[in-house]
């Protein structure tokens, strides 16, 4: 049974309160979305505090990122959300967060990816059934030109259909799922892994 627009908007509001409460979406940073229809998405409007969202703080867009609601301004990063809905029709929710761990780890990693292996919590990601796997998370350099950034992301997505998320350097994390609960689960898993990685590097640096 399909959810109504109001139910989907409430999911976004609830996600904002949860993610703000965990410190992963401070102030007016971050943006969230759900799929509204095969050709439409419901996204947070620009400039709103994510811990204080209301049902009117979302708007519908087409999959080219154009607002379908006059008077409401979509986030500058809308295209990165709609790109994912166009890429895989089974994606039902996309979350973009600005946590300290994601920001710092992406800045400290000189490579264009980070890889996680042998962590039990990798099984929290869709399609991963064992810790004996590798989860590679690409890191793209930040770019204020979102269309140009999306053009860099697209080839990775096409070459890695099992991708579960990506980082923007010094900026934050994008992840997604079939529904909002899946995307939220993956946010938590990523944050756990990011913290483990940072602590591991800290210990190794002290030992070195």
Swiss-Prot record:
What EC class is this?
Answer: lyase
Keyword annotations of the record: Amino-acid biosynthesis, Lyase, Metal-binding, Methionine biosynthesis, Zinc
Can you tell me which residues the record assigns to a coiled coil? none
Catalyses: 5-(methylsulfanyl)-D-ribulose 1-phosphate = 5-methylsulfanyl-2,3-dioxopentyl phosphate + H2O
Binding, Zn(2+): 96, 98
What the entry lists under InterPro entries is as follows: Aldolase_II/adducin_N, Aldolase_II/adducin_N_sf, MethylthioRu-1-P_deHdtase_MtnB
* A Gene Ontology BP annotation from the UniProt entry: L-methionine salvage from methylthioadenosine
What is one GO cellular-component annotation here? cytoplasm
Q: Needs which cofactor? A: Zn(2+)
Reported EC number(s) for this entry are: 4.2.1.109
The pathway noted for it is: Amino-acid biosynthesis; L-methionine biosynthesis via salvage pathway; L-methionine from S-methyl-5-thio-alpha-D-ribose 1-phosphate: step 2/6
User: Any binding details for the cofactor?
Assistant: Binds 1 zinc ion per subunit.
Show the GO MF annotations.
methylthioribulose 1-phosphate dehydratase activity; zinc ion binding
The record's similarity note reads: Belongs to the aldolase class II family. MtnB subfamily.
Say what the protein does: Catalyzes the dehydration of methylthioribulose-1-phosphate (MTRu-1-P) into 2,3-diketo-5-methylthiopentyl-1-phosphate (DK-MTP-1-P).
Report the HAMAP family cross-referenced here: Salvage_MtnB
Specify the protein name: Methylthioribulose-1-phosphate dehydratase
């Amino acid at each position: 049974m399909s959810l109504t627009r109001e139910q989907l908007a409430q999911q976004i509001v609830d996600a904002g309160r949860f993610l703000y409460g965990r410190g992963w979406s401070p102030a007016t940073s971050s943006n969230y979305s759900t799929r509204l229809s095969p050709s439409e998405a419901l996204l947070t409007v620009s400039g709103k505090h994510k811990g204080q969202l209301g049902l009117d703080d979302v708007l519908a867009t087409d999959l080219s990122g154009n607002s379908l609601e006059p008077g409401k301004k979509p986030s500058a990063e809308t295209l990165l959300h709609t790109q994912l809905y166009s890429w895989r029709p089974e994606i039902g929710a996309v979350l973009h967060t600005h946590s300290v761990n994601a920001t710092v780890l992406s800045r400290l990693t000189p490579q264009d990816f980070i890889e996680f292996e042998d962590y039990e919590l990798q099984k929290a990601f869709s399609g991963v059934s064992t810790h004996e796997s590798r989860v590679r998370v690409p890191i793209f350099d930040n770019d204020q030109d979102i269309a140009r950034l999306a053009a860099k992301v697209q080839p990775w997505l096409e070459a890695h259909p099992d991708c579960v998320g990506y980082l923007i350097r010094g900026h934050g994390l994008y992840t997604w799922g079939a529904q909002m609960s899946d995307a939220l689960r993956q946010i938590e898993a990523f944050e756990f892994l990011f913290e483990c990685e940072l602590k591991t590097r800290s210990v190794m640096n002290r030992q070195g």
